[in-house]
Amino acid sequence: MHNEQVQGLVSHDGMTGTQAVDDMSRGFAFTSKLDAIVAWGRKNSLWPMPYGTACCGIEFMSVMGPKYDLARFGAEVARFSPRQADLLVVAGTITEKMAPVIVRIYQQMLEPKYVLSMGACASSGGFYRAYHVLQGVDKVIPVDVYIPGCPPTPEAVMDGIMALQRMIATNQPRPWKDNWKSPYEQA
């Protein structure tokens, strides 16, 4: 090895090794603060897209109304285009014929995207044990938060959204999303 290369390991641009590490760590601190600011912005500006097929969709409408005011948690206006939304709220029964449609909607959403399964029908098929009903939307798309109930109360929906916001704020890893392959995905 050349003498300059060996010397470059010890010092950088005429600084001692500790000075170089201090200067480099300042850049990392800035990056971590920037990540925290981005997470704060994502947490407080969720744009939900409701996919309501049953009574849970009616409950979601009441949560979006003035009595419960979901806007104070950052979910201001429901979006009806997947390209403008980052939170897919699946509220109601999902049948086998609906599955390719919901997968396509999920694929059209921009990253980062989140899925909230609202109610017993979306989470586990509900009381329908028929051949045409999916036993949970997590069979076709990855779900971040499950909200129990038939239908869930507006307070439970708000708790589910706040749980999702806590997950976003802490940058929790989502391994179920990274390795997900849906049986309905198009190549």
Curated annotation (Swiss-Prot):
Organism field: Bdellovibrio bacteriovorus (strain ATCC 15356 / DSM 50701 / NCIMB 9529 / HD100)
GO BP term, example: aerobic respiration
Cofactor(s) listed in the protein's UniProt record: [4Fe-4S] cluster
Cofactor note: Binds 1 [4Fe-4S] cluster.
Full protein name: NADH-quinone oxidoreductase subunit B
Keyword Cell membrane: yes
Residues the entry annotates as binding [4Fe-4S] cluster: 55-56, 121, 150
Function of the protein: NDH-1 shuttles electrons from NADH, via FMN and iron-sulfur (Fe-S) centers, to quinones in the respiratory chain. The immediate electron acceptor for the enzyme in this species is believed to be ubiquinone. Couples the redox reaction to proton translocation (for every two electrons transferred, four hydrogen ions are translocated across the cytoplasmic membrane), and thus conserves the redox energy in a proton gradient.
Enzyme type, top EC level: translocase
EC number: 7.1.1.-
Gene: nuoB
One Gene Ontology MF term: iron ion binding
Keyword vocabulary terms for this entry: 4Fe-4S, Cell inner membrane, Cell membrane, Iron, Iron-sulfur, Membrane, Metal-binding, NAD, Quinone, Translocase, Transport, Ubiquinone
